[in-house]
From Swiss-Prot:
PANTHER family: DYNEIN REGULATORY COMPLEX SUBUNIT 3, PROTEIN PHOSPHATASE 1 REGULATORY SUBUNIT SDS22-RELATED. GO terms for biological process: cilium-dependent cell motility. LRR repeats lie at residues 66-90, 92-110, 111-132, 133-155, 157-183, 250-275, 419-442. Belongs to the DRC3 family. The lineage of its organism: Eukaryota, Viridiplantae, Chlorophyta, core chlorophytes, Chlorophyceae. It is found in: Cytoplasm, Cytoskeleton, Flagellum axoneme. This is Dynein regulatory complex subunit 3. SUPFAM superfamilies: Outer arm dynein light chain 1 (SSF52075). Keywords: Cell projection, Cilium, Coiled coil, Cytoplasm, Cytoskeleton, Flagellum, Leucine-rich repeat, Repeat. Disruption phenotype: Defects in DRC3 give the dc3 phenotype characterized by reduced swimming speed, increased flagellar beat frequency and abnormal flagellar waveform. Pfam families: LRR_9. Component of the nexin-dynein regulatory complex (N-DRC). Found in a complex with DRC3, DRC4, DRC7 and DRC11. Component of the nexin-dynein regulatory complex (N-DRC) a key regulator of ciliary/flagellar motility which maintains the alignment and integrity of the distal axoneme and regulates microtubule sliding in motile axonemes. Required for normal flagellar waveform.
Length: 524
């Protein structure tokens, strides 16, 4: 007969409390007494492993402050939903076996998970695991998985080596094992059994037609992903180099030109645009090369500057540490004198006070020198970087002047062609009626045609001017922001260092007062 305690536990589910959490902390190695004391006192932020097994938990909650947790056991409880785990982003091992979970959810942020057990639950579908790219071990045995093709979902996990699906309805299919082995790559263990390479080959041959089609799709997807990655990388570089919008300028000019669709209805009117486009592409390629070269120079300039700054500060920090170490040694010697030679204690403490004041002066002198040197380095970088920004500004102005000249040339050609076309279709016996309605409207009224051409030209010039203004402003602003942030950093570094020196001084003054008090107490 079940015990009273067990019946009560089944009726009244448990909840996670601080005391329960401490009880469930797992300490690796060490003496039992030491481990027990650590469980009682260690900060939650230092806990790496928790085991809530067999605690009759109905839900997952109250795990805040355990952000460094790497292993969490929640097996053999009454949990129905995976929740409140999103902040445990350092988890590599999670056991939710033997619960009442009906759906996989709430694991999206646990991207470091390597081992996940959902064994013996009520899960009907494999889903919502896409972000767990490091998954190596997955146990979904004894659930309610009934669709064999759902196993295909696991093909995306490149690190998956051990899978357990035993005890699910899908296992009753005569194709179950061959389907899993053919569709999940590089498995080493399936349902507690080591995978035989010969079985994998036989499974792939059995599902050959499907595998060929699948591999073709994956190859196409891989190519698309590669192209997307290259495009994203290129777009990122263009943005970093302040070239965003340059490559698409000519297309954007047309896209935002309300008159362009109407003008394109007039035969041969826009033919000069092809020549303009070719010249634009040539100018743009040359411009991109120049700006990217400047971009690399700016990066190199900043990295070189950072290297000089770090090297100098490391040198000054080493100098300061040496002085502090010497003082700390003197302090230890003085402390021993207070204990061993009370009659000499007072003079030794006075000497130590003198050394402390001298140390303060030395540290302050080092810091003042550092401030002066850093100020010079910041100003030097400001000048060098601003020069590069000004060179870039000239590059932008030169490029957009070329583009404007192209647009003006196109407008002149367009006007000339428009007059020729207008005269052609306004002669007797012209076939103007065969043209689209928009074209007829333009060619029947010279003013309308010229107004449309002018509006188109204005739209193009406006787009050119707008992009130039934006890029030049970005260039100068980013240079100003960087130099300003350097100056802000230098000021904050100085304040922090002065604060460190003062705090160190005050702390040691208190220690000397305590030491003097001990000396007086010893004399009494």
């Amino acid at each position: 007969m079940p015990s009273l305690e067990r019946l009560i536990a089944e009726v009244e589910p448990n909840v996670i409390t601080e005391s329960l959490t401490r009880e469930c902390i797992q300490i690796q190695g060490g003496e039992p007494d030491t481990a027990a004391n650590k469980k009682r006192t260690m900060p939650f932020r230092d806990v790496e492993c928790l085991a809530f097994s067999f605690k009759n938990l109905a839900c997952v909650d109250n795990l805040r402050g355990l952000d460094t947790l790497t292993k969490l056991q929640l097996d053999n409880n009454q949990i129905t939903k995976i929740e409140n785990l999103a902040h445990l982003t350092n988890l590599t091992w999670l056991d939710l076996s033997f619960n009442k979970i009906t759906a996989i959810s709430g694991l999206e942020t646990l991207t470091k998970l390597v081992d996940l057990s959902l064994f013996n639950n009520q899960i009907a579908k494999i889903e919502n695991l896409d972000t767990l790219v490091n998954l190596n071990v997955l146990s979904l045995g004894n659930n309610q998985l009934s669709q064999l093709d759902n196993v295909m979902y696991l093909r995306q996990f490149k690190q998956l080596r051990l899978v357990n699906l035993a005890g699910n309805p899908i296992c009753k299919s005569h194709d179950y094992r061959s389907y899993v082995l053919s569709h999940i790559k590089d498995l080493i263990y399936l349902d507690y059994r080591r995978v035989n390479p010969a079985d994998v080959q036989a499974a792939r041959e059995q599902h050959q037609d499907e595998m060929i089609e699948l591999q073709e799709r994956e190859e196409q997807q891989s190519q698309e992903e590669k192209l997307n990655a290259e495009r994203e990388s290129h777009e990122k570089l263009m943005k970093q180099a302040n070239l965003e919008g340059v490559e698409t300028l000519i297309d954007d000019m047309v896209k935002e030109d309300l008159e362009w669709p109407r003008l394109s209805q007039v035969p041969s009117l826009l033919d000069p645009w092809n020549e303009i486009r070719d010249k634009f592409n040539t100018y743009t390629d040359e411009f991109k090369v120049a700006i990217l070269e400047q971009h690399n120079k700016k990066k190199a300039e900043y990295e070189e500057w950072l290297g000089v700054v770090r090297s100098y500060l490391d040198e000054k920090d080493a100098e300061a540490r040496k002085l502090i170490v010497e003082y700390e040694k003197a302090k230890k010697r003085t402390a021993r004198v207070v204990v061993d030679q009370p009659l000499m204690a007072e003079s030794q403490i006075d000497n130590l006070k003198v050394k402390l004041m001298a140390l303060k002066d030395q540290l302050m002198a080092i810091e003042m020198e550092a401030v002066e040197v850093l100020d010079g380095l910041v100003q030097e970088f400001d000048r060098a970087y601003s020069e590069l920004a000004e060179i870039n500004k000239g590059q932008y102005n030169g490029y957009f002047t070329q583009v404007r000249d192209l647009q003006n040339s196109f407008f002149n050609q367009l006007t000339s062609v428009a007059m020729t076309v207008f005269e052609k279709y306004n002669q007797e016996n012209s076939d103007i009626e065969s043209l689209p309605e928009e074209a007829r409207t333009l060619l029947q009224d010279k003013d309308s045609l010229m107004n449309a051409l002018q509006a188109s030209h204005d739209a193009h010039m406006g787009k050119i001017d707008s992009l130039e203004d934006r890029l030049v402003s970005n260039e100068l602003r980013s240079a100003n922001d960087l130099t300003s942030s350097n100056a802000t950093w230098a000021t904050k570094r100085n304040r922090d260092r002065i604060s460190e020196i003062i705090n160190y001084l005050e702390r040691n003054v208190l220690e000397l007062e305590e030491l003097a008090g001990e000396e007086e107490g010893g004399e009494m």
